[in-house]
Amino acid sequence: MKTLRELRNKISFDKNIDSGSSSSNIGGSSSNSSGTTNKRSSGNFNGSSASSSPSSSTNIDYNIPTFSNIQNIDWKSISSVEKIDFGNSNIFLLITFNNNNNINNINNLNCNCVNNNNNNICNNNCINNNNNTNDENPSIINNYNESQILLKSSSTIAHDVYAYVLEGILKYPIPEMRLLDFSNLEYTEMSYNLLIHSKDDQSLNDFIKSELEKSFFLILEYRNNGKRFNELNHKEYFSGSKGGKKFKQLGKIIAFDIFCNNFCKLPSPPLNWNSSTFFSNILCYDSPDKNGWYFSLINSNISFLNTSPFTIGYRDHLNRLKLLLFSIFQNPSTESVQIKLMRDHLLKCQGIKLSGSSVSYLQKGIAKGIKSIVNCINFTVLENTKEKVKNIVKLDNNNIWKKSIDSIYCPFLLDVLNEIVIEFANYREKTYFIKA
């Protein structure tokens, strides 16, 4: 059996395959403070390109930022608070602000990042996200409606931050974001105003109180006019000349789900699937962003398997993974068992009918996403990212953050990655179909 590195170095791609697999800094991921309120420093990487070769990625430092452009928020200017349930326990608060107050506070920063070439980090630690920023003025988020943001908290929010960093490396369409922790004065200001503006809705007020018992919130960009997957007119949305491209992008999203233990879930699907199992973590748009994405990943939907490699469940999971990858790479135009299960589930539980023609595009997208994972991710990246994400929080009440990070089982992710690399190497002669 060849080693993982040998298999990586062995892979040679068809000349027709898109060459754009370079790594990217995650845009505006996590932060411990807002604006000038509390500039506590925390660990970060100096991002650099990973477009040379898969094996060279061990020398790459990926940026885990501590600030983002979503800062200096005037929480007193909240006009409404709404709870949005995306399914799979992904509940967000949609915060709407009075435009005149909050836009000025967000955009009128004394920011030098327009003239700064230091790999996406300006002197104020603003993050110039390659995926989301405006080319002419990188300090202002492209397509960002500054009058609204999303808030999310969970007991495993560190998993989300970890996944967002990996998604940023893979150049997925992640929103601008930052982390706000309980030790920050802004956390108190946010809490007070959220409770004030929800006092007339007892259910919402109770929910906010329960969320505020948690120590960390993610503040995320909200690009308006997006629809949830189950709200689409799917026949209309995926028709026309761009329908195939949209399905391929969904396939790339599935590829990351495969890597992070979502698509091949335990117990065997569809026993643990529900009405929001697939694509509950995305917003869909009629028009693409500047990088051509029609989707935005508002939640990682990640669920790491933390168990022994000697258990039956562990091996069953990897066997299902191998079967899926074998099917996709061996017969790219023939529907794999798990893609068929997904389509059947969407039709039965949500009344969503994805056409038979979608199969080829979805599986091409999965293969393209797998190519990117093989190129950009390795065990060093997984471990270094885990360590750096662990260290971005300086005050960790009851070790909540540390425990969440420690539950990320990198050996399992490496085993999954190993299977992906092996299957990709075995059937790379068929990778002509990955062309975007």
From Swiss-Prot:
Coiled coil: none annotated. Belongs to the protein kinase superfamily. AFK Ser/Thr protein kinase family. Its EC number is 2.7.11.-. Residues 18-57 have a biased composition (Low complexity). It comes from Dictyostelium discoideum (Social amoeba). CDD domains: AFK. InterPro entries: Actin-fragmin_kin_cat_dom, Kinase-like_dom_sf, PI3/4_kinase_cat_sf, Put_AFK. Residues 14-58 are annotated as: Disordered. The keyword Kinase applies. It is an enzyme of class 2 (transferase). It comes from the Eukaryota. This is Putative actin-fragmin kinase DDB_G0268748. Signal peptide: none annotated. GO terms for molecular function: protein serine/threonine kinase activity. Keywords: Kinase, Serine/threonine-protein kinase, Transferase. The keyword Transport does not apply.
